[in-house]
């Protein structure tokens, strides 16, 4: 009787969706200040360019790595003050999801978890370079994911014609 109850509970657990963050880590980190120290003596009127990218790969079994890349180029006038980049990664255990839910989880939910860590790593890197803190705004990864799906759908329709 107990074996049946245990096997029934195990079967129910294997059918329920599961999500677990296994590890968060910095995969790559870089900082360049090509015009230092001269840039520090200039009036500070920065313009900030931010590039954001995500990628994911399946590891063994139900484990997935998601990498969020934030690249920032800050110019003071026409000169590049600094370039900073962080690749913040995470390993996630994800199972029991249909294909659409898995795609959304990897493309929006996981990057949303990684973003605060990437933002903090980037901010720390910039301030250690003796520049003012960046204070990056939150990112709506659900909206970015929806835009990417729409772009892919339109590209597929264009290729079909």
UniProtKB/Swiss-Prot annotation:
Listed InterPro entries: SecB, SecB-like_sf
Major location category of this protein: cytoplasm
Pfam families for this protein: SecB (PF02556)
GO MF term set: unfolded protein binding
Protein family (similarity comment): Belongs to the SecB family.
Entry keywords, A to Z: Chaperone, Cytoplasm, Protein transport, Translocation, Transport
Reported function: One of the proteins required for the normal export of preproteins out of the cell cytoplasm. It is a molecular chaperone that binds to a subset of precursor proteins, maintaining them in a translocation-competent state. It also specifically binds to its receptor SecA.
GO BP terms in the entry: protein folding; protein tetramerization; protein transport
Highest taxon above the source species: Bacteria
Keyword Transport: yes
Organism: Ectopseudomonas mendocina (strain ymp)
UniProt protein name: Protein-export protein SecB
């Amino acid at each position: 009787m107990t074996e049946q109850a245990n096997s029934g509970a195990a079967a129910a657990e294997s059918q329920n969706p599961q999500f677990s963050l296994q590890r968060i880590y910095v995969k790559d980190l870089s900082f360049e200040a090509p015009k230092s120290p001269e840039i520090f003596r200039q009036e500070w009127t920065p313009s900030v360019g931010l590039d954001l990218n995500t990628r994911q790969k399946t590891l063994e079994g139900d484990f997935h790595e998601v990498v969020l890349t934030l690249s920032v180029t800050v110019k003071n006038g026409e000169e590049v003050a600094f370039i900073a980049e962080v690749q913040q990664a995470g390993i996630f255990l994800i199972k029991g999801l249909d294909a659409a839910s898995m795609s959304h989880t990897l493309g929006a939910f996981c990057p949303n978890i990684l973003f605060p860590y990437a933002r903090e790593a980037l901010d720390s890197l910039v301030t250690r370079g003796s520049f003012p803190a960046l204070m990056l705004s939150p990112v709506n990864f659900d909206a970015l994911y929806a835009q990417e799906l729409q772009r892919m759908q339109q590209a597929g329709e264009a290729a079909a014609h």
